[in-house]
C-alpha cells in the first residue's frame, strides 16, 4: 500500500481536553504518534507512508507556534533518524526547503543520505508543502525545458509531468486518511491523489493508533477501485 495521512487534530486535542495547556502540547502528542504509526505501517505491510506534517499555509500561524513546531521537527530528526535507519526505513522530505532553517535542511539531507538504501518502508514527511506550489514548480521545470529547446511542448504527457514532480520517487497514494473529522484535502498532493481512495475518521491525530490505521486499510480493501472506468 501507498498511504498518505493528513495530521489533523493536534490543536483540537487541547481545546477538547484542557484550556490551560499550551497550544504546542497537542503538537508534541502528535509527534509521538508518528512513531506509533510508522511501526504500525510496517506491521500492516505498508510500503510507502507519507505524513502531511506542515503545510505551506502553516507559515501564517503565530510566530511562536511556528518556532515551537520547528523545534519539534529538530527534536524528531535528532531522536528518531538513527532508529528509522536501524529498522530499515527510508526517510524522505517533500516541500519547499528554502523556507526551512539551514540547520533543519542539513539534518534532513543527512537523514536522507543515511537511509537512502533502506527498503522496509519509505517514510515521507511533507513539510512546508503545498499541492498547488508543487504543480506550479513542475510546470516551471517543463516550461524551462521548452524555453531552452530541450523539449517539444507537444511531447508533454502525464508521465512526463509526474517525473517533474518532487514526489516522482514513490507511487501515487492508494489511500489518503484524514483525521479529526475534517472532510477536505487541504492543498495536499492535488495531482497525485487523482484516483486515491479517501477515508475520513473522527479520531484526532494525537489519538490515532494501530487500530485506526488497520481499520482504514480494511475499509480501503473492501472498495472497488475503477480508476474512472465503469467496470
State where each predicted segment sits.
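Short, exposed "boundary/linker" segments that immediately precede the start
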Residues: 1-3
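Flexible, compositionally biased loop and terminal segments
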Residues: 5-11, 15-231
